[in-house]
Amino acid sequence: MSNDPTHQFLIQKIVPIEVGGIDFSFTNASLFMAASAAVAVGFLYFATSNRAIVPGRSQSVAEMSYEFIANMLKEGAGKQGMKFFPLVFSLFMFVLTANLLGMFPYFFTVTSQIIVTFALAILVIGTVLVYGFYKHGFHFLNVFVPSGVPGILLPLVVAIEIISFLSRPISLSVRLFANMLAGHITLKVFAGFVASLGALGAVGVGGAVLPLIMTVALTGLEFLVAFLQAYVFAVLTCMYLNDAIHPGGH
C-alpha cells in the first residue's frame, strides 16, 4: 500500500466525530491545515516580537514577505487594494506554509486536496462579489462589459465574460491542486525507483544513481514550485480583487 504514489493523499480520520449523522471527524487534513496556520502565525509572531533596527534573518524574511505582498497588491489593485492586505497576505502565507510542510516525509499536503483549494478559491471570489456589490451596487456588473466592444458583439462578449468569471474558482483551485498533486506523485515514483533498485544489491545500487539524482533535482524543483504556486495564487487574487475595486476598468 505504501508503494502506491497516491496513498499519501488519502484522508484518514484521527478523531472520529459524528453528530446527527454528519461526519465532523478530525482528520490528517484538519491537523495539517491547523499546523500550517499555526506555523505561519508562529513564525511571524516570533520574527517580529523583538524587532530591531538591524533585522535578523527571521525579521528580514517577515519584512520581505510583507513588502512583497504589499507591492503585489499596489501593482495589481492600486492603493485601494491595500484594504485587502490582511486577506491576501494570510492566503499567501497559508498556501506557502502548507506547500512547504508537505515537502517533509510523512507530512500531509493539504493543498493537494481539491476541496481545500476550492474552499480558498471560493473565499476569494466570494470576497470579490460581496465587496463589488457593496461598494458599487449593480454598477459592479460593468465588470462583464469590456470597454470599446462594438454593440453587435456585446451580447457574445458579455456571455464569454460571465463564463470566464464563473470559471475563476475552478481554475484557481485546480491550478494549485494539480501542481502539488503531480509534483508529489512524481517524487514518490522516483523515490520508489531508488528504493526498489537499492534493494537489489550492488548492481541495483549502481542503477539507482540516476533516479537518485533525479529525485534530488525534483525535490529542489518542488520547493520552487511550492513558492511559485503560493505566488500565483496571490497574484490572481489581487487581479480578481481589482475587478471588485475598479469594475469595468478593462
Swiss-Prot record:
It holds the Pfam family ATP-synt_A. Belongs to the ATPase A chain family. GO terms for cellular component: plasma membrane; proton-transporting ATP synthase complex. Keywords: ATP synthesis, Cell inner membrane, Cell membrane, CF(0), Hydrogen ion transport, Ion transport, Membrane, Transmembrane, Transmembrane helix, Transport. F-type ATPases have 2 components, CF(1) - the catalytic core - and CF(0) - the membrane proton channel. CF(1) has five subunits: alpha(3), beta(3), gamma(1), delta(1), epsilon(1). CF(0) has three main subunits: a(1), b(2) and c(9-12). The alpha and beta chains form an alternating ring which encloses part of the gamma chain. CF(1) is attached to CF(0) by a central stalk formed by the gamma and epsilon chains, while a peripheral stalk is formed by the delta and b chains. InterPro entries: ATP_synth_F0_asu, ATP_synth_F0_asu_AS, ATP_synth_F0_asu_bact/mt, F0_ATP_A_sf. Its main location: membrane. It is found in: Cell inner membrane. It comes from Rhizobium etli (strain CIAT 652). This is ATP synthase subunit a. NCBIfam families: ATP_synt_6_or_A, PRK05815.2-4. SUPFAM superfamilies: F1F0 ATP synthase subunit A (SSF81336). The chain crosses the membrane at residues 29-49, 84-104, 114-134, 143-163, 193-213, 216-236.
